Swiss-Prot record:
The lineage of its organism: Bacteria, Bacillati, Bacillota, Bacilli, Bacillales. It comes from Staphylococcus epidermidis (strain ATCC 12228 / FDA PCI 1200). This is Bacterial non-heme ferritin. GO terms for biological process: intracellular iron ion homeostasis; iron ion transport. Residues 2-145 form the Ferritin-like diiron domain. Disulfide bonds: none annotated. It is found in: Cytoplasm. One of its GO terms (molecular function) is ferric iron binding. Keywords: Cytoplasm, Iron, Iron storage, Metal-binding, Oxidoreductase. Iron-storage protein. Fe cation 1 binds at E17, E50, H53. It catalyses: 4 Fe(2+) + O2 + 6 H2O = 4 iron(III) oxide-hydroxide + 12 H(+).
Amino acid sequence: MLSKELLAALNEQMNQEYFAAHAYMAMAAYCDKESYDGFANFYIEQAKEERFHGKKIYDYINDRGEHAIFDTIKAPKVEFSSILETFKDSLAQERDVTQRFYNLSELARNDKDYATISFLNWFLDEQVEEESTFETHIDYLTRIGDDCNTLYLYEKELAARSFNEQ
């Protein structure tokens, strides 16, 4: 059985994952509006991944005999000045999520809830990958700058991204 504090924190994180999916869809909409189809695809696939994370937490809460509680999801930011800004915002969001998982892990450790600690380790590993991915994209976009030809090729690469549940 999960402690009340840990259950509340897991429910909050589940909702945060669904907010992240909304935020990535807002970024996809910006990219589509600006005719960056490859970047839009990247963010659509990223949103699928975040929904998968939310469902994973939902399943865990229910598997532990508790009740997953859905809350109102606030509206995400919808206006951006550039593709680079979307990636910088994404990195900030992922860093916030990483900190949330650290806090969840600390709660689970304090509760000596070893099953939850094990469950959360998957997310901690995932967050290392997420942050690295966005840092790399920011580096590439910064180097590309205003080079339209290179940006076009990079966008085509991102158009091929496809999320596969693991």
